[in-house]
A protein has these predicted regions:
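Sec-dependent bacterial lipoprotein signal peptides
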Residues: 1-9
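Conserved Rossmann-like nucleotide-binding pocket used by diverse enzymes
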Residues: 7, 84, 114
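Periplasmic c-type cytochrome electron-transfer domains
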Residues: 11-75, 121, 144-155, 175
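Flexible coil segments in periplasmic/lumen-exposed cytochrome c-class electron-transfer proteins
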Residues: 22, 117-123, 138-182
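Short Fe-S-cluster ligation motifs
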Residues: 36-42, 118-133, 140
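Sequence/structural segment immediately N-terminal to covalent heme-attachment motifs in c-type
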Residues: 73-97, 110, 125-126, 131-132, ...
Length: 182
């Protein structure tokens, strides 16, 4: 008898008979009067995942991309500086020399971005490392969206240029300002 009562209780239609809105029905709950809601930001429509796009993978035909898949602008580099400060500088240091605060606390030192091997690495290499991790570095794919990964890479390139820049690298109009400064 008790078993029959337990089984009968499990036969309720709660999941079938639940309060819900039908697609495109009217709704008094939402201010716009529609039950259909816009997709959450970052939603990918079925069949539209850009898994083969260089922007999202950092690769073309399996090889790291040699050039940025988006225009590099001052705004992109500034965004990269902001993101680098948050995600990268604790280990890699503010100058990209591998002397971040975690190293001073006894953790393993990451490589400097200023060694020839990394100065010559294509942007796709950095994208892959940020996405998948490398050595002691964990993947940042879940924390840093692709747009910000490219921004960070642009900033790393700016850091690399800044550490070995000469007067000949300065545009002529700015060079005159520097030479005339006291």
């Amino acid at each position: 008898m008790i078993a029959l009562a337990l089984v009968a209780g499990a036969c309720r239609q709660d999941m079938h008979d639940q309060p819900k809105y039908k697609p495109l029905a009217a709704s008094a709950f939402f201010a716009d009067g529609k039950a259909a809601r816009p997709p959450v930001q970052g939603t990918v429509a079925r069949g539209h995942l850009h898994a083969e796009d260089a922007f999202y993978t950092g690769r073309v035909r399996g090889e790291p991309v040699a050039a940025f898949p988006l225009p590099v602008s001052r705004q992109l580099i500034e965004r990269g500086r902001e993101r680098y400060t948050v995600f990268c500088s604790p280990c890699h240091g503010a100058l990209g020399d591998g002397q971040g605060m975690v190293v001073r606390r006894g953790f393993r030192q990451p490589p400097s971005f200023h060694v020839d091997r990394l100065r010559q690495a294509p942007p796709g290499h950095y994208f892959d490392v940020i996405t998948n991790g490398f050595g002691a570095m964990a993947s940042y794919a879940s924390r840093v969206p692709p747009e910000d990964r490219w921004a960070i890479i642009a900033y790393v390139r700016a850091l690399q240029l800044s550490q070995r820049a000469g007067l000949e690298d300065v545009p002529p109009e700015k060079r005159k300002e520097l030479e005339s400064a006291p």
